[in-house]
Amino acid sequence: MDRGRIAVLVSNDLAFDQRVRKTCSTLLDAGWEPVLVGRRWRWKDEKNIDRPYPNFRIWLPFKTGPLFYLSLQWGLVRALGRCRGEYGCSAVWANDLDTLWPAVRASRRWGWHIAYDSHEWFTEAEGLKGKPIRKALWLWWERRAFRGISRMLTVNGSIAEAYRSKYGKQVDVVPNVPERAEAALPMPRSFLGWPENATVMLMQGAFMDRDRGALDAVRSLAHLPHHHLALIGSGPEHDEAFAVARRLGVEQRLHVHDRMPFEQLRRCTAAADIGLSLDRPTVDNFRFSLPNKLFDYLHAGIPVVCSDLPVAGRFVREEGIGVVAAAAEENGDIAQCIGEAVRSLLQDGPEPDHLAKVAERHHWGAHSTAILGALHVPR
């Protein structure tokens, strides 16, 4: 059934956003043809990426700060005009708050169906911590944009309940789970520079923001003298990891890799022994998150060590997929708790068959009804 074309908006460079890729695949399977719109990080980057549907990336003169977000809004407004005129779009899908206003504007102006997917609790994100004026502006922006929608998606029940209580919207939950697929063939450790006969802990994430646990993982190596740590991704903590490792004298056991395409990431994940998810509860967006890396580890068949947070910690305990590290506040205490959790996991961790059974219950296809149901007429 051909439903027409739908503009899908995102503020990143398209290449590494797995949730958006999966959303577009679901829309495509249901008869929609997505037209994916993102941005180019650098002027020399290609305007398109390799996908089985139309896509283009807009160039913005600013990369961060208020001027970036202002230029993004008008860049997306112009892009939606192109989606309507050149591609014949009749619906729009906004991903996160920074793309919602252009989508609401288009849906009201042209009578398009609209969908909104909040990938995080945007106004409680790390980047707004200690910035009350900037946070107040985003809250005002959110209230204004939310007038144009009556329902939305988000990533877990705690964030969904917060939006329901605040705005009275219908909020459906679609967690950041992988698509159902055959188990990935582990990447040869020799190719990655990992040791063959040592325990390798992995922390992966497209962007490692402050307090996402990368530096805590590095510090834990001081308590795990025979273990290695691999970091895959980008971001401030990713960049600082080697400096911390050198101060502790553990740099020989740290392996840092840039972010990589999803299929390559799956193979690297399958080559590790333990997956780490170590967010600190510094902001509500972290405190109530259910990171997609937990599900990536699960589908790769490796157990996890997770920080003691309300949503992620409960999931790990209830599903029996790893060990929750004891809560602590000081850097040294956190690292020690991680080390103790890793040792506990290696002594008495979940069996591979159990991980496979849990993974079978948590996959993207199980949420297709909620995803397609997010499209609605504008208010």
What are the functions of these language-model segments?
Residues V77-G81, W101, R105-R109, Y116, ...:
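Membrane-proximal helix-turn-helix segments that form the acceptor-binding/catalytic region
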Residues A328-D333, L346-L375:
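A charged, aromatic-enriched C-terminal amphipathic alpha-helix characteristic of glycosyltransferases
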